Amino acid sequence: MIKVSDVCFSYTNNMDQLVLKNINVVFEKGKYYAILGHNGSGKSTFSKILSGIFKPQKGSIEVDGVLLNKENLTKIRKKIGIIFQNPDNQFVGATVEDDIAFSLENINEDPKKMSQIIANLAAKVQMESYLDREPQFLSGGQKQKVAIASVLALNPEIIIFDEITSMLDPRGKYDVVKILDDLRKDKTKTLISITHNMNEAILADEIIVFANGGIIAQGDPKLILNDKNIIEKAKIDSPFIYKISSALKLVSPTYDENELLEQLWKLKQKTS
């Protein structure tokens, strides 16, 4: 579990120029959280604070009851894996196989087990046919798959995904979101995704909405993303299924919008 209490952050150390203002939130073990917000809302800064890259000027973060500070940073970082928007700087191996192996070596995995673990992880992200390829020559979606496999090899309790689909083409986005959903169903890790991708966000157990450095909403995706006031205040786009629902309401004011929305929601979950 991650507990964030009254966190404030400023890039200038000026408390009158806060990027994050009094953030309070709890991330429960085994849940999938999507963090939404407009550019400059503070969500990406928040992800870097969670991973220990930035230190807040005020407030505290606890991971499984251990305070995130200088003394505990190394211990806590072993529990956290992070995947960035551009994974190129995360690759350390000459091949996909080497990159995954490097993560296993970091956790002192038994060398006799490594080949099978690498094969299993590559299959999990649909990259088993690319183990001998150089990561830098892969497509954007393939690179993100390798980054996910390498982080999974570290076996962290918490994984932070920082805008990992924002630079991908539609096929790449679909593949990566499918992997995230498989991880969500597994429920063994806490997943925190900073995203603009609504197809990704609607699969979360909870959505947290940032605006102007603060949290303005948190809860069930169906309720949050169908609230026009929240959507407008956060300056984010409505998911496609809600746009369909709203359009049909204009065509036929008598139809039951909530019933159709529920049907669309179930269809989305079945096809994801």
Swiss-Prot record:
- Which Gene3D superfamilies did the record assign? P-loop containing nucleotide triphosphate hydrolases (3.40.50.300)
Question: What topology does it adopt in the membrane?
Answer: Peripheral membrane protein
InterPro entries, alphabetized: AAA+_ATPase, ABC_transporter-like_ATP-bd, ABC_transporter-like_CS, ABC_transpr_CbiO/EcfA_su, ECF_ABC_transporter_ATP-bd, EcfA_1, P-loop_NTPase
Got a GO cellular component term for this one? ATP-binding cassette (ABC) transporter complex
Function of the protein: ATP-binding (A) component of a common energy-coupling factor (ECF) ABC-transporter complex. Unlike classic ABC transporters this ECF transporter provides the energy necessary to transport a number of different substrates.
Assembly behavior? Forms a stable energy-coupling factor (ECF) transporter complex composed of 2 membrane-embedded substrate-binding proteins (S component), 2 ATP-binding proteins (A component) and 2 transmembrane proteins (T component).
Name used for this protein in its record: Energy-coupling factor transporter ATP-binding protein EcfA1
What is the protein's species of origin?
Answer: Mesomycoplasma hyopneumoniae (strain J / ATCC 25934 / NCTC 10110)
